[in-house]
Amino acid sequence: MPYFTTKDACKIFYTTYGVETSNPVVIFLNGTTQTTLYWGGLVPAFSKHFGLLCYDARAQGQSDLGDIPISLKLHVADLKDLLEYLAIDKAHLVGMSHGAWVALAFSAEFPEMVDHLVLCSLSAKTNDRSRAIVRSWLEILRLSGLEAMAWAALPTVFGNSFLNQHRKILDKIVDAVVLRNGRRSLIAQLEAVLRYPPPGNMTKNLNQPALVISGVDDPIIDPSDVRRLADLCNARHAELAGIGHSIPAEAPRIVEKLVLEFLSGSSEY
């Protein structure tokens, strides 16, 4: 399995599909509790048009936690070093939730390395409810462990339609979260997120074409704050009815169509 080792000896897991100098590259950035496997449903369609890079950020999935306290700045530095290691000079970034936060911060700091920017389930600020949700996950994780936290998170990370359609396999979804995450690493992730700067503060220097995608049935982010982020990024905004926070998992074919059309500038890509 491919790993990149950072300057502080933290191993970052990644996987690539057709990354060559002649191919434009799309980078998928995971949300909290997610791994590179999260993007599996999008790989077949996207790999026909782009080289792909999926990676587990520090403390996610198969990547190490490392010894340095996690911060948004550290995630940005890790991605910059990974791209230099892979000789990727410029790429399209597609981020989901936490991954969108990292993608936005990276785009603000290294605009010359970002072609197009796609932000799923991110808003201009974290309101009191979203902070309370993250804090509740953190406390449940500390007091009762990963399985309890995963069950508690389900109604906030998935919309009602998805929960209804997949009610017979919710236990398997929870099992997957437990299998792919470590308690100590996830605690570090959630503690760090509560310290991140508001996404809206990182939009001043953006000059890339941007697309913001949100779900109407998402309790974590406020619709008005999502629209504010889209305005700050001068971005197109797609709001999906009946979809919750985990947009690529809940509506993969819609995301596939929206993003491929956006990246290609065509309705036929």
Give short role names for the model-derived ranges.
Residues 95, 99, 103:
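Gly/Ala-rich beta-loop-alpha elbow adjacent to hydrolase catalytic centers
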